[in-house]
Amino acid sequence: LYTYPENWRAFKALIAAQYSGAQVRVLSAPPHFHFGQTNHTPEFLRKFPAGKVPAFEGDDGFCVFESNAIAYYVSNEELRGSTPEAAAQVVQWVSFADSDIVPPASTWVFPTLGIMHYNKQATENAKDEVRRVLGLLDAHLKTRTFLVGERVTLADITVVCTLLWLYKQVLEPSFRQAFPNTNRWFLTCINQPQFRAVLGEVKLCEKMAQFDAKKFAESQPKKDTPRKEKGSREEKQKPQAERKEEKKAAAPAPEEELDECEQALAAEPKAKDPFAHLPKSTFVLDEFKRKYSNEDTLSVALPYFWEHFDKDGWSLWYSEYRFPEELTQTFMSCNLITGMFQRLDKLRKNAFASVILFGTNNSSSISGVWVFRGQELAFPLSPDWQVDYESYTWRKLDPGSEETQTLVREYFSWEGAYQHVGKAFNQGKIFK
């Protein structure tokens, strides 16, 4: 796969290959591939007449360009759509990404990266278009985990990659909060192992990036100026460091300017620990998790928990899904729980939970018992943790009460009468 580094269009094929098992070797740097040079050579143009990247060459000599075509080629039947109807819907969303998302996303994001001039009216129009797109997706995803069917397809891969720079660069919390279903789906996808293997850890935008006129000016190629005679007195009088700086500034911006900018943006400082302000606690959650994972729950893990639990440094909470009437198939309800856990991945060091699905198809409920660092709900501490929690009611538990003792025992062991539920245990999920 010929491409330049951090090309979001190439990500589509690489993520698809993670799902299908296709072995793809990436050539994105000299001497194998130099963007702006290699793709203009006669040899490259014989294989790929458009001279565009990404471009794919198979071991058997098969060549194809255009990112959607490459992603389709390296996919399997499940990703492409296993029925004619599903396949048509996949093509629908892939086309939608190109026609409805790429244009406004480019108009809005590119100026903030310093690679396109800013036009206020065009940017405002682009923002409106992005709102429309996110709203359309939000309505579609209200009752769906993924865009087509119950598993990831090329539709999800393509639309996620197309939205990637919007979420990283300009969709700050206040803008994206109006689209909870789209946010939930996006976070579910990027936290799948196959996505993470290609994208790494995606940091969502915290403050909308703005156009920087200076950055834009610096990114433009400089006009040629008359060369001074070698060894001129004026040149010799300047300090060596200053001459180097002038030489560096005079160099034209490389054709890969977008990619260098993307890489710089990706190299962001590590986020602060949202729990750093809390005093140290004697309760070591990781040790309890080891007991819970490796020892008997009732005879070892629970006694350890109550013996070491620090009620001042930690708190217990009972949660219940607000909309049980919307729960239909049990496997879809389980997807709600799993998706929430995936989106809370960074919370694992400071939380533990047992969440249970009760009942059967079209008659079920979800509730759980959570352990959090501190005395308040942890979700408001990070925008990334706020996607799901408002879909649940939360009640703080008294560690000393008999009710809490019963809830912790039943939910942590997955055994008991669950008299407060009124439905039979179906299955449970552990967040640890």
Swiss-Prot record:
Protein origin, superkingdom: Eukaryota
Comp. bias intervals (Basic and acidic residues): 216-249
Location of N6-acetyllysine modifications: 142, 207, 396, 429
Listed SMART domains: EF1G (SM01183)
Molecular functions per Gene Ontology: translation elongation factor activity
Domain GST C-terminal residue range list: 83-211
Database matches in InterPro entries: EF-GSTs (IPR050802), EF1B_G_C (IPR001662), EF1B_G_C_sf (IPR036433), Glutathione-S-Trfase_C-like (IPR010987), Glutathione-S-Trfase_C_sf (IPR036282), Glutathione_S-Trfase (IPR040079), Glutathione_S-Trfase_N (IPR004045), GST_C (IPR004046)
Residue ranges of domain GST N-terminal in the record: 1-82
Cross-linked residues, Glycyl lysine isopeptide (Lys-Gly) (interchain with G-Cter in SUMO1): 248
CDD domains, sorted: GST_C_EF1Bgamma_like (cd03181), GST_N_EF1Bgamma (cd03044)
Domain EF-1-gamma C-terminal: 271-432
Positions of region (Disordered): 216-258
Quaternary structure annotation from Swiss-Prot or TrEMBL: EF-1 is composed of four subunits: alpha, beta, delta, and gamma.
Function in brief: Probably plays a role in anchoring the complex to other cellular components.
Protein name per UniProt: Elongation factor 1-gamma
Species this protein is from: Sus scrofa
Gene designation: EEF1G
